[in-house]
Design a protein with these regions (language model features):
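Peripheral interaction segments used for macromolecular assembly
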Residues: 1-208
Length: 208
C-alpha cells in the first residue's frame, strides 16, 4: 500500500530526449521537472485514487500555471524518492482523464474534509489514505482532529468500504465507524505500555 501523504511534496519528472550532441547516444533520455505532488484526486464514489494534482513552477517566477493531473498508474518512484512519468502519451491531464474514463467534475479531494457518520456524528477530518499501487483502490482513510490532538489520541482508520459518499462538504461514513478504536496516538501507546507493565507486574507478583 502507498500512503498519499508520503507522496505529497515529491518532485515529478517527465522523460525528454536529450539534445543531439556529437558522440551522444541517439536514444539517451533526460528528465525534465514537471512540478510537485500536492493533492490526491479520488473517484466519484470516493473509494479509488484516480491520480494526483501536481503544482507546476511559475513562469519566470511570477505567472502561475494551472496544476497538472498525473494518473495513478502513470508514474514510478525512483531511487531518490522522486516520481517519473511512465506513460508519456496518456498519463497526464486530459489524455489521462479520457483514458481512465473519469467524470472529472464529480471526482473528490478528501484531504482536509470533515468526516461524519450517516447519523451525523463528527469524527474529525480526513488526514491521509492508503491505496493499492496496482489497482488504485483505497484500503483505508485516516480521520482525526489534527495537530496536537491527533498526536495524543491518534486517528480513526476507516476502511474504504465504510465510505458512503460525499454530502455538503463532508465525507459520510457508516455509523459503525464511530466504534472503531483510535490508534497511533501517544496516549494510546502510553496506555498500551501501562497495560503491558501491569500484566508483567501481575505475573511477577503471582510468581512471588
Amino acid at each position: 500500500m502507498l500512503s498519499i501523504n508520503d507522496l505529497y511534496g515529491r518532485k515529478v519528472y517527465v522523460p525528454k530526449k536529450a539534445k543531439k550532441k556529437k558522440g551522444a547516444e541517439p536514444d539517451e533520455i533526460k528528465l525534465g521537472k514537471l512540478g510537485k505532488v500536492h493533492m490526491a484526486v479520488f473517484s466519484p464514489d470516493g473509494r479509488e485514487v484516480v491520480g494526483f494534482l501536481v503544482t507546476r513552477p511559475d513562469i519566470v517566477g511570477m505567472v502561475k500555471r494551472p496544476d497538472a493531473f498525473l494518473a495513478w498508474d502513470s508514474f514510478r518512484i525512483l531511487d531518490d524518492g522522486t516520481l517519473c512519468l511512465t506513460r508519456e502519451g496518456d498519463g497526464l491531464d486530459d489524455a489521462a482523464r479520457k483514458r481512465l474514463g473519469v467524470d472529472w467534475d464529480s471526482c473528490v479531494m478528501w484531504e482536509g474534509m470533515d468526516a461524519k457518520t450517516a447519523s451525523g456524528k463528527k469524527l474529525g477530518y480526513v488526514s491521509n489514505a492508503d491505496f493499492d499501487a496496482k489497482t488504485g483502490l483505497v484500503g483505508s482513510f485516516y480521520v482525526g482532529d489534527g495537530g496536537v490532538a491527533r498526536a495524543l489520541v491518534g486517528t480513526f482508520q476507516i476502511p474504504a468500504s465504510m465510505v458512503k459518499g460525499y454530502s455538503n462538504g463532508c465525507m459520510i461514513v457508516d455509523d459503525a465507524a464511530a466504534n472503531i478504536e483510535l490508534g497511533g496516538g501517544a496516549a494510546a501507546k502510553a496506555g498500551e505500555g501501562f497495560a503491558k507493565a501491569k500484566v508483567k507486574g501481575s505475573e511477577a507478583a503471582h510468581k512471588a
